[in-house]
């Protein structure tokens, strides 16, 4: 079990190392996926601040949002709207070691529909 956790952490760090070069120019859209909810935030690594954030726990969704793909897509759209309000349109997608499939893919597509470019 610990070997799987170690491999997952290595995959995430390898992904972030590649993104470090690109995130100097553009902010990073970071995704965290739990068993109950999905969280995303746009991070400006040069200043070390979170520019915009959204999750399936937001008041906008009430109690209806959860772990499904549709909720992830809505979180992506909400994050894109908040990022555009903050003046961000171009980001680097940090999937955090997660496979680009299912909820992570739905969040990315929702953010693209909302107007983010990556």
From Swiss-Prot:
Q: Name one GO biological process term.
A: translation
Q: Where in the sequence is the signal peptide annotated?
A: none
Source organism's superkingdom?
Answer: Bacteria
InterPro entries for this protein: Ribosomal_uL18_bac-type, Ribosomal_uL18_bac/euk
What's in the keyword line of the UniProt record? Ribonucleoprotein, Ribosomal protein, RNA-binding, rRNA-binding
What SUPFAM superfamilies does UniProt report for this protein, alphabetically?
Translational machinery components
Asked if the keyword S-adenosyl-L-methionine belongs to this entry, the reply reads no
Q: Name one GO molecular function term.
A: 5S rRNA binding
Any one of the GO CC terms: cytosolic large ribosomal subunit
What protein family does this chain belong to? Belongs to the universal ribosomal protein uL18 family.
Q: PANTHER family from the entry?
A: 39S RIBOSOMAL PROTEIN L18, MITOCHONDRIAL, LARGE RIBOSOMAL SUBUNIT PROTEIN UL18M
HAMAP family linked: Ribosomal_uL18_B
Q: How does it assemble?
A: Part of the 50S ribosomal subunit; part of the 5S rRNA/L5/L18/L25 subcomplex. Contacts the 5S and 23S rRNAs.
In UniProt terms, what function does this protein have? This is one of the proteins that bind and probably mediate the attachment of the 5S RNA into the large ribosomal subunit, where it forms part of the central protuberance.
Q: Quote the protein name from its UniProt record.
A: Large ribosomal subunit protein uL18
Origin species: Parvibaculum lavamentivorans (strain DS-1 / DSM 13023 / NCIMB 13966)
């Amino acid at each position: 079990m610990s070997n799987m956790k170690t491999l997952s952490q290595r995959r995430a760090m390898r992904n972030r190392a590649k993104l470090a070069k690109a995130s100097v120019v553009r902010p990073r859209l970071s995704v965290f996926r739990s068993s109950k909810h999905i969280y995303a935030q746009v991070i400006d690594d040069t200043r070390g601040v979170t520019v915009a954030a959204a999750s399936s726990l937001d008041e906008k969704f009430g109690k209806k949002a959860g772990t499904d793909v549709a909720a992830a897509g809505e979180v992506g759209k909400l994050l894109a709207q908040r990022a555009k309000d903050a003046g961000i349109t171009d980001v680097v997608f940090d999937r955090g070691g997660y496979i680009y499939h299912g909820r992570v893919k739905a969040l990315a597509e929702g953010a693209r529909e909302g107007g983010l470019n990556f």
